[in-house]
């Protein structure tokens, strides 16, 4: 964000719960809560919903002069999206500026920290309700024991540029 302010007003495309749920687990904070946090960061002028994993629709609608992105998308699941972003920005006469990715600051490490703290049945129930509202299909797998639960929690599959995970697990004590 600090680097982006050098180029003009900073508009953040923030993924909606629905967009996130298509690729990974639902975040702990709702879209509105995350928006509140992001719009109060120094340098951010506006936060717009990003309804899809792809940046393309927002780029076509907003037509920015620049898009600033960490260079972590040169490899991995976002590399195809990077190509599309370059194409759209070139068509619109804009420029993509890649800056060094900040190691250690990401949602995955935050997720690990929150998991270490634990949760309550009430929090899990509220999360399930949000998840059902955010996704057309919720992926739940039955766990026989703690080891199965750990596998379910950490299993992920890459399909092209899309990462799929189980949204939750269920255990029966028949």
Predicted feature locations:
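Alpha/beta enzyme core
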Residues: 121-174
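Nucleotidyltransferase catalytic core that binds NTPs
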Residues: 1-120
């Amino acid at each position: 964000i600090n680097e982006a302010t050098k180029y003009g007003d900073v508009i953040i495309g923030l993924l909606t719960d629905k967009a996130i749920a298509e690729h990974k687990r639902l975040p702990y904070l709702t879209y509105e809560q995350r928006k509140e946090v992001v719009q109060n960061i120094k340098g951010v002028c506006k936060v717009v919903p990003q309804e899809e994993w792809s940046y393309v629709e927002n780029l076509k609608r907003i037509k920015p002069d620049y898009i600033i992105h960490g260079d972590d998308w040169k490899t991995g699941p976002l590399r195809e999206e990077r190509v599309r972003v370059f194409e759209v920005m070139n068509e619109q006469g804009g420029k993509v500026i890649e800056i060094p990715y900040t190691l250690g600051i990401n949602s995955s490490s935050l997720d690990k920290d929150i998991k270490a703290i634990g949760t309550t049945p009430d929090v899990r129930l509220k999360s399930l309700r949000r998840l059902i509202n955010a996704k057309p299909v919720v992926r739940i797998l039955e766990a026989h024991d703690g080891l199965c639960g750990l596998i379910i929690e950490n299993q992920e599959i890459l399909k092209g540029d899309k990462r799929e995970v189980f949204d939750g697990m269920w255990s029966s004590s028949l």
